[in-house]
């Protein structure tokens, strides 16, 4: 299973027009039962295929914590998550499953004020059983996503 990340054009536009900031905005991570990336999405919504509020997951997900950008002289610019959500290690987003647990095939990062950032397709179903954890470990080397110019 390969993980594929798609960045929403609305977020790129927001960064270029200074309406959004990877390091300053409050960013959440939500889990989905289907990968639903659409280039035309301009607003994050909890409707559709987001994992339901139950068994240790809450609709809307949770804040991912601290984010960084590599040095402006580095190519590509690496956008990383270095904080933690859910009591996990730095650079992770974690939920503790209860009851029957839950399953997700994708995660979406979004600015809490409404702009979707990216869709992370896990390449298949990932399940956390009751008492287990569902952990996303963000790539500490290459970042969640990057931007490069030539």
Where are these regions (language model features)?
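Small cysteine-rich, disulfide-bonded extracellular modules of the LU/uPAR three-finger superfamily
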Residues: 1-105, 112-150
């Amino acid at each position: 299973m390969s993980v594929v990340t798609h960045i929403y054009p609305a977020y790129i536009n927001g960064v270029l027009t200074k309406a959004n900031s990877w390091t300053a905005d409050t960013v959440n991570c939500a889990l989905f039962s289907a990968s639903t990336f659409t280039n035309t999405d301009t607003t994050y919504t909890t409707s559709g295929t987001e994992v339901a509020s139950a068994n240790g997951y809450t609709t809307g997900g949770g804040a991912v914590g601290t984010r960084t950008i590599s040095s402006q002289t580095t190519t590509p610019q690496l956008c990383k998550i270095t904080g933690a959500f859910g009591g996990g290690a730095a650079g992770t987003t974690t939920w503790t499953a209860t009851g029957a647990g839950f399953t997700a095939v994708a995660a979406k990062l979004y600015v809490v004020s409404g702009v979707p950032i990216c869709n992370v397709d896990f390449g298949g179903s990932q399940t956390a059983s009751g008492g287990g954890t569902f952990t996303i470990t963000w790539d500490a080397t290459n970042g969640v996503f990057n931007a490069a110019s030539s």
